[in-house]
Curated annotation (Swiss-Prot):
One of its GO terms (molecular function) is structural constituent of ribosome. This is Small ribosomal subunit protein bS18. It comes from Nitrosomonas eutropha (strain DSM 101675 / C91 / Nm57). The gene is rpsR. PANTHER family: 30S RIBOSOMAL PROTEIN S18 (PTHR13479), SMALL RIBOSOMAL SUBUNIT PROTEIN BS18M (PTHR13479:SF40). The lineage of its organism: Bacteria, Pseudomonadati, Pseudomonadota, Betaproteobacteria, Nitrosomonadales. Binds as a heterodimer with protein bS6 to the central domain of the 16S rRNA, where it helps stabilize the platform of the 30S subunit.
Length: 76
């Protein structure tokens, strides 16, 4: 039981806090924050992103991968 954190940090939606309305597939720096080290999309339950923005985020990452702006895997 000693491994439990003293307090749990409240998750918040980054897009709601910053006032972002639409997620653009060309904003690679923003999209990289929501991709794990091995190239997988981080789920909303971990990032705290609202479902409305998570769907936009998934679509933007898929489009960026298709256009070779983002890699599909970490090393290929």
């Amino acid at each position: 039981m000693a491994n439990r954190p003293l307090f749990k940090r409240k998750k918040f939606c980054r897009f709601t806090a910053e006032g972002i309305k639409k997620i653009d597939y060309k904003d690679v720096d923003l999209l990289k924050d929501f991709i794990s080290e091995n190239g997988r999309i981080i789920p909303a339950r971990i990032t705290g992103t609202r479902s409305y923005y998570q769907r936009q985020l998934n679509l933007a990452i898929e489009r960026a991968r298709f256009l070779a702006l983002l890699p599909y895997t970490d090393q290929h």
